[in-house]
Amino acid sequence: MKIAEIKEMTTNDLVERVEAETANYNQMVINHSISPLENPAQIKQLRRTIARMKTELRQRELNNK
């Protein structure tokens, strides 16, 4: 997910998406520990996407104060 797409999302959508992606990330890590994924780089990409979304949420929080 690109930064521009993240900035277009509403705050509520971002919160929901972060929760969903975090659950997906945790499941992916568990599955990878049991049997290797075809593309383990997906874990890294997902972790960074979650970080981008959390960063945008934090920026919005600081700008609203």
UniProtKB/Swiss-Prot annotation:
Q: Which PROSITE patterns does the record match to this protein? A: RIBOSOMAL_L29
Q: Which Pfam families match?
A: Ribosomal_L29
Tell me which CDD domains the record gives. Answer: Ribosomal_L29_HIP
Record keywords, A-Z: Ribonucleoprotein, Ribosomal protein
Q: Which GO terms describe its cellular component?
A: ribonucleoprotein complex; ribosome
Q: InterPro entries from the xrefs?
A: Ribosomal_uL29 (IPR001854), Ribosomal_uL29_CS (IPR018254), Ribosomal_uL29_sf (IPR036049)
Quick one: a GO biological-process term for this protein?
A: translation
MF-aspect GO terms: structural constituent of ribosome
**Family the entry assigns:** Belongs to the universal ribosomal protein uL29 family.
What protein am I looking at? Answer: Large ribosomal subunit protein uL29
Highest classification ranks of the organism? Bacteria, Pseudomonadati, Bacteroidota, Bacteroidia, Bacteroidales
